[in-house]
């Protein structure tokens, strides 16, 4: 497992704490007066380094690429959204790590405010954004500080994430005086997009998946876990005679591994992309080996060409490739052909 890298999209939670006065106890349990403190949360979007329109405009510059970019814009903007749909807040006592308070709030905006009440104590606050909205990720171990995780659906192959996932962790010492805290919500997933140019070659279909990305994220210590193996099925769009295979996933490991390829060679990669091209009378499978890690909050675009045999040839020299000609469907990952 690896520590998360603070990259890309960020939201900020500003926390202001003040002693509760008598008027704040109206309509509340009076036994709590003098023991609880009012915590006012302000959730707002601060900046978005991963600006999808800017990245697509910079990377996809030809007329054909711009047509493809118009098809990629909506799904990628949803992943790298500038708003939060919902917020899941957990307050754990320290040092025991037991859950003391839990709240969920619908936001659907870049800015929201609400109030919670906490007793004088040391806490660690863990905040999750969009974890409920994302159907392929579950919140697990929510009753204990060190077990709270974002976990992908357990399966050999899953679809691409559709939402950006954000988390924060904040140590809080509630004392009988006014205080303020600031906690950043960082994006914990990412996305990659393969741009495929078939040229004059007649391609009947394209499918693919992303491999070697994390499956779980431990929120309290900000680490990704890779013990389970799940590949993420890429989504296909087309435009301008080009194909785009995009997938939103968790990040890859930081350190590349060495793989033995089917071409009796070795390749180093932090993550891999599998692509199957259907030609008129055959299938060709290409595995791309990407040595540069895929970071949290990042949108990575890799351009390739499809040659007359259906092989995918990357434009980047540091991306390796191995090819299986006359590949047979079945017995591989469950991807649409």
Annotated model-derived regions:
Residues 21-24:
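C-terminal motif of bacterial Sec signal peptides marking the signal peptidase cleavage site
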């Amino acid at each position: 497992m690896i520590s998360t890298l603070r990259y890309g999209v960020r939201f900020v939670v500003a926390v202001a704490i003040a002693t509760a006065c008598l008027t704040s106890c109206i309509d509340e349990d009076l036994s709590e007066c003098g023991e609880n403190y009012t915590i006012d949360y302000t959730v707002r979007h601060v900046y978005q380094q991963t600006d999808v329109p800017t990245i697509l405009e910079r990377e996809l510059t030809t007329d054909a690429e711009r047509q493809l970019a118009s098809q990629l814009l909506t799904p990628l903007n949803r992943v790298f959204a500038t708003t939060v749909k919902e917020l899941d807040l957990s307050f754990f006592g320290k040092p025991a790590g037991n859950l003391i308070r839990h709240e969920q709030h619908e936001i659907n905006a870049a800015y929201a405010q609400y109030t919670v009440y906490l007793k004088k104590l040391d806490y660690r606050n863990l905040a999750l954004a969009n974890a409920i909205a994302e159907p392929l990720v579950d919140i697990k171990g929510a009753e204990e500080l060190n077990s709270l995780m974002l976990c992908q659906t357990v399966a050999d192959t899953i679809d691409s994430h559709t939402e950006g996932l954000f988390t924060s962790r904040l140590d809080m010492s509630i004392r009988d005086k006014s205080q303020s805290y600031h906690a950043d919500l960082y994006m914990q997933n990412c996305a990659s997009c393969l741009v495929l140019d078939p040229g004059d070659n007649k391609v009947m279909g394209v499918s693919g998946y992303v491999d070697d990305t994390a499956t779980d994220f431990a929120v309290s210590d900000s680490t990704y876990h890779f013990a389970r193996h799940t590949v993420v099925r890429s989504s296909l769009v087309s435009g301008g005679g080009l194909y785009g295979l995009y997938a939103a996933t968790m990040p890859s490991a930081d350190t590349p591994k060495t793989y033995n390829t089917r071409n009796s060679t070795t390749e180093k990669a932090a993550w891999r992309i599998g692509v199957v091209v259907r030609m008129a009378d055959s299938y060709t499978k290409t595995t791309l080996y990407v040595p540069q890690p895929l970071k949290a909050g990042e949108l990575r675009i890799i351009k390739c060409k499809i040659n007359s045999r259906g092989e995918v040839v990357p434009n980047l020299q540091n991306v390796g490739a191995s090819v299986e000609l006359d590949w047979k469907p079945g017995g591989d990952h469950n991807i649409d052909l």
